[in-house]
Amino acid sequence: MLSSFPVSATQLGDTIAAVLGDKVKSLKIALGEVTVTVGAADYLASAVLLRDAAGCRFEQLIDLCGLDYSEYKDGQYDGLRYCVASHLLSVSLNQRVRLKVFCPDDDFPVVDSVNGVWNSANWFEREAFDLYGIIFEGHNDLRRILTDYGFIGHPFRKDFPTTGYVEMRYDAEQKRVIYQPVTIEPREITPRVIREDNYGGLQ
């Protein structure tokens, strides 16, 4: 049964802190929302606790996404680069929490998959892998989901070029779609304004 009167963010934060204990790296409350960050080694266990603990009961994962912090705060950020953020919902207790975990290795970002905890994580984790290159350990079908299987790189990484590396086009001679190096040339477009005499009835 849905609770009509959810606890306050402060109360929820206290409950989560008590449930997760020393697994909590940080816990913040902003705009009435609770964000808890755990270590990569405790991520899977924390997910199970948040789902099953009496004061939490986050039965649904409603979103999971990757984040690239390499340009955070105009490049002044010096923490770990890749993060996975999950948004959890308790239907029975009418409350939400954001769960974050940072990948411990910037060169080879890996965290545990929570697909076994929430089935909805399946495609979300595939999307984060496709766009950010984050590996989800234990995921049983970690394939690209948005880009082509032959795509080079991960397009949501901050260092990925806006134009990409290759483009696809139909080759009439080969009668098939082919890849070729990007042919877009960057150019600067400066708008030119021509103001006529007595423009708009003004002298």
Swiss-Prot record:
Single Gene Ontology MF annotation: NADH:ubiquinone reductase (non-electrogenic) activity
Reaction equations catalysed: a quinone + NADH + 5 H(+)(in) = a quinol + NAD(+) + 4 H(+)(out)
Record GO cellular component, one term: plasma membrane
Keywords recorded for this protein, A-Z: Cell inner membrane, Cell membrane, Membrane, NAD, Quinone, Translocase, Transport, Ubiquinone
EC number: 7.1.1.-
Name of the top EC class for this enzyme: translocase
Recorded topology in the membrane: Peripheral membrane protein
UniProt keyword annotation of Ligase present: no
Pfam (any one): Complex1_30kDa
InterPro entries: NADH_DH_suC (IPR010218), NADH_quin_OxRdtase_su_C/D-like (IPR037232), NADH_UbQ_OxRdtase_30kDa_su (IPR001268), NADH_UbQ_OxRdtase_CS (IPR020396)
Subcellular location: Cell inner membrane
Role according to the record: NDH-1 shuttles electrons from NADH, via FMN and iron-sulfur (Fe-S) centers, to quinones in the respiratory chain. The immediate electron acceptor for the enzyme in this species is believed to be ubiquinone. Couples the redox reaction to proton translocation (for every two electrons transferred, four hydrogen ions are translocated across the cytoplasmic membrane), and thus conserves the redox energy in a proton gradient.
Similarity comment: family membership: Belongs to the complex I 30 kDa subunit family.
Subunit structure of this chain's protein: NDH-1 is composed of 14 different subunits. Subunits NuoB, C, D, E, F, and G constitute the peripheral sector of the complex.
NCBIfam families: NuoC_fam (TIGR01961), PRK06074.1-1 (NF004730)
Entry-linked PANTHER family: NADH DEHYDROGENASE [UBIQUINONE] IRON-SULFUR PROTEIN 3, MITOCHONDRIAL, NADH DEHYDROGENASE UBIQUINONE IRON-SULFUR PROTEIN 3
Listed HAMAP family: NDH1_NuoC
Protein name: NADH-quinone oxidoreductase subunit C
